[in-house]
């Protein structure tokens, strides 16, 4: 409980758009502000004041023109928001003759005028609101306390309260907004008089700033307090999210940025509010703008929030125990980097809080560094100085720097410490002829995208294809990973027809996605299989992979029938020659081939449910046998000199029966730098 203020200042705002329950939901700007002072001690009301506010966009809806009788010409000469607020502050100060011990508080009809209009607009325009706008009385809630028998709060408005008290509607003022302020003044006088004797003692509060913090996985979170924000700029921080929801109270540590499988932000965040009321107001900001981007806002659950922000790591809790710190994430550190080197990297202009204690290195479960770290700074100035070092060198590597959040720290540590991003294969044997997805066909109804940004998502690809996105077969978008489990910059897409695939390749080739141009090639499922096995595909045609080159041996030798499985020792042979990649199982996990597989692509990124996903990359058993198509045996030579030629290799095998020079396959091992040769003998 707090002491009752001496005065209430009744405040009513009008925007250039919707009124009533939809006020502020259309992101329209404030154009008119009314206020009136109510003396609670002497039970008197002051004069009605108003000020026109010039919006940046001089456009009024028809409903607004009809309600307010305001035209664009009158607004063009009005005061801007900061000037109007100074005029309001000066007027209230003069009327109340504010001195030592004099107090006043705003009073509004509901939450929208302060939370959905003034705070969001002032934040966007970088206008500093006076302190009085951070607390206010909601007349509807106060009326419900005063008159418990009145209608529910969501059904209350000025007209309903006036009717409940048997007041006649104010006839002295007929203008919209002015009449509401007149009636609100009369309602307040009735509430503080007999028989109600109501005291205004517990105002609503607006948070000054967002507080970061940790969240335990054991914490119970109300499902009705969480939203999912989608479409965020990738560089946005929790402070940017708090600014987008300015006026609404976010719980401590309640802004959690979501990361994708590669540990990068995916443009989504989960936000937890202090109450269901604030969550509902947040949903009204659906498709409001953050800069030039509109943000989608949807309901989410407490479980969703805990999956992202929850954690129990003592190391993280200790690191985040220092409050009011700005967190910066470092990415691309040398694996041998030490805390002393990180401290020296930032230097004296941006000292790290606590020195080495303010650095948290991210490691895998076995203790190996990931190249990521989080650093604490005591203030915004130090953090900004630190971010200016983005892409500066530490050793021989450039370091990427981003603003971060407590939830992101927890999420990254959970991701790397619990299990590898790419689980390692454990079976002691490798299937030779696993099941295949779809038989390869010569119909060129597929397209290949090459040069995608590494952070590209399924949604980015659909936006990139534009009108052709509707021609994608159900579950036909596949993003390919490299042998490290990271995006390769390639994707394969199965279209509904060869004609549409041709048109997509023609119109989208070298079209930009973000800051990169993307190459688009038409191909068939069979050509796709060739590419995934090591071949190349471009606009000049197809070059077959090594395993499809001729492999000749004396016809007199018959090769034994292959077994269903082979021991792991067979990994010394090129897998594209002797075995198929393991078939993908229906799951959302990543499926790498083992480190012994030397393929162009050893795994792919499965499309999420509802996205296009049934095209197989791997050839069927009919087109890829478990052994070379001709009788013979393949051996691998490792450690050759870089200038070794075919003649030297054949001389080396002198005395053995080997194939012709056509049976010599040149290869490069992706995991090593040593040259190798494959010889059919």
Swiss-Prot record:
Disease link: Deafness, autosomal recessive, 109: A form of non-syndromic, sensorineural deafness characterized by bilateral, congenital, severe to profound hearing loss. Sensorineural deafness results from damage to the neural receptors of the inner ear, the nerve pathways to the brain, or the area of the brain that receives sound information. DFNB109 affected individuals additionally exhibit vestibular dysplasia, although they do not manifest problems with balance or movement.
Q: What induces it?
A: Down-regulated during the epithelial-to-mesenchymal transition (EMT).
Expression across tissues: Epithelial cell-specific.
- Known Gene3D superfamilies for this protein? 3.30.70.330, Ribonuclease H-like superfamily/Ribonuclease H
**Which SMART domains does this one have?**
RRM (SM00360)
Report the superkingdom from the record.
Answer: Eukaryota
Q: Which residues carry this modification: Phosphoserine?
A: 543
According to UniProt, the name of this protein is Epithelial splicing regulatory protein 1
Similarity comment: family membership: Belongs to the ESRP family.
Q: Where in the cell is it found?
A: Nucleus
Write down which residues bear the modification named Omega-N-methylarginine. Answer: 582
Q: Name one GO cellular component term.
A: nucleus
Q: Per UniProt, which keywords does this protein have? A: Deafness, Disease variant, Methylation, mRNA processing, mRNA splicing, Non-syndromic deafness, Nucleus, Phosphoprotein, Repeat, RNA-binding
Function recorded in the entry: mRNA splicing factor that regulates the formation of epithelial cell-specific isoforms. Specifically regulates the expression of FGFR2-IIIb, an epithelial cell-specific isoform of FGFR2. Also regulates the splicing of CD44, CTNND1, ENAH, 3 transcripts that undergo changes in splicing during the epithelial-to-mesenchymal transition (EMT). Acts by directly binding specific sequences in mRNAs. Binds the GU-rich sequence motifs in the ISE/ISS-3, a cis-element regulatory region present in the mRNA of FGFR2.
Q: Which InterPro entries match?
A: ESRP, ESRP1_RRM1, Nucleotide-bd_a/b_plait_sf, RBD_domain_sf, RNaseH-like_sf, RNaseH_sf, RRM_dom
């Amino acid at each position: 409980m707090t002491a009752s203020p001496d005065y209430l200042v009744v405040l009513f705002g009008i925007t250039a758009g919707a009124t009533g329950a939809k006020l502020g939901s259309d992101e329209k700007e404030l154009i008119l502000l009314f206020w009136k002072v109510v003396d609670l001690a002497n039970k008197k009301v002051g004069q009605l004041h108003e000020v026109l506010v010039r919006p940046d966009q001089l456009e009024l809806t028809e409903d607004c023109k009809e309600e307010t009788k305001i035209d664009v010409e009158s607004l063009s000469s009005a005061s801007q928001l900061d000037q109007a607020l100074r005029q309001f502050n000066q007027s209230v100060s003069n009327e109340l003759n504010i001195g030592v011990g004099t107090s006043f508080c705003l009073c509004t009809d509901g939450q929208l005028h302060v939370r959905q209009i003034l705070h969001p607009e002032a934040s966007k325009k970088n206008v500093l609101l006076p302190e009085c706008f951070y607390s206010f009385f909601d007349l509807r809630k106060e009326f419900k306390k005063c008159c418990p028998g009145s209608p529910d709060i969501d059904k209350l408005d000025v007209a309903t309260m006036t009717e409940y008290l048997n007041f006649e509607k104010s006839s002295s003022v007929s203008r919209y907004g002015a009449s509401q302020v007149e009636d609100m003044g009369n309602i307040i006088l009735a509430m503080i008089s007999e028989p109600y004797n109501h005291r205004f003692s517990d105002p609503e509060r607006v948070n000054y700033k967002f507080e970061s913090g940790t969240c335990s996985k054991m914490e119970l979170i109300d499902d009705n307090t969480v939203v999912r924000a989608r479409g965020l700029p990738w560089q946005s921080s929790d402070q940017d999210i708090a600014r987008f929801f300015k006026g609404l109270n976010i719980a401590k540590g309640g802004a959690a940025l979501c990361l994708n499988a590669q540990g990068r932000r995916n443009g989504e965040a989960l936000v937890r509010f202090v109450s269901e009321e604030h969550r509902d107001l947040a949903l009204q900001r659906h498709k409001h703008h953050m800069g030039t981007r509109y943000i989608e806002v949807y309901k989410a659950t407490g479980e969703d929030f805990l999956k992202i922000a929850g954690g129990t790591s003592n190391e993280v809790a200790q690191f985040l125990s220092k409050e009011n710190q700005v967190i910066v994430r470092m990415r691309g550190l040398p694996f041998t980097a030490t805390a002393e080197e990180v401290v020296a990297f930032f230097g004296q202009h941006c000292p790290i809080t606590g020195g080495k204690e303010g650095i948290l290195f991210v490691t895998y479960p076995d203790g190996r560094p990931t190249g990521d770290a989080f650093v604490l700074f005591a203030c915004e100035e130090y953090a900004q100085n630190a971010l200016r070092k983005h892409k500066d060198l530490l050793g021989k590597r450039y370091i990427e720097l981003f603003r971060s959040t407590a939830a992101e720290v927890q999420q990254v540590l959970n991701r790397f410490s619990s299990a590898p991003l790419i689980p390692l294969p454990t079976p002691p044997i490798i299937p030779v002829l696993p099941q295949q997805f779809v038989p390869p066909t010569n119909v060129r109804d597929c397209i290949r995208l090459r040069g995608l940004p590494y952070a590209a998502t399924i949604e980015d690809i659909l936006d990139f294809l534009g009108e052709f996105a509707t021609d994608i077969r159900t579950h036909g978008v596949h993003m390919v990973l490299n042998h490290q489990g990271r995006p390769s910059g390639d994707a394969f897409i199965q279209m509904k027809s060869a004609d549409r695939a041709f048109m997509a390749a023609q119109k989208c080739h070298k079209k930009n996605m973000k800051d990169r141009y993307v190459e688009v090639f038409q191909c068939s499922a069979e050509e796709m299989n060739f590419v995934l096995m090591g071949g190349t595909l471009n606009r000049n045609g197809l070059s077959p992979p090594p395993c499809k080159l001729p492999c000749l041996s004396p016809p007199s030798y018959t090769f034994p029938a292959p077994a269903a499985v082979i021991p792991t020792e067979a990994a010394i042979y090129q897998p594209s020659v002797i075995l198929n990649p393991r078939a993908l199982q229906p799951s959302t996990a990543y499926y790498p081939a083992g480190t012994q597989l030397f393929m162009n692509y050893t795994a792919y990124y499965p499309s999420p449910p509802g996205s296009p996903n049934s095209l197989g990359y791997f050839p069927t058993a009919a087109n890829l046998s478990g052994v070379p198509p001709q009788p013979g045996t393949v051996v691998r030579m490792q450690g050759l000199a870089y200038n070794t030629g075919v003649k030297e290799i054949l001389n080396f095998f002198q005395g053995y029966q080997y194939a012709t020079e056509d049976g010599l396959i040149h290869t490069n091992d992706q995991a090593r730098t040593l040259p190798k040769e494959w010889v059919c003998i």
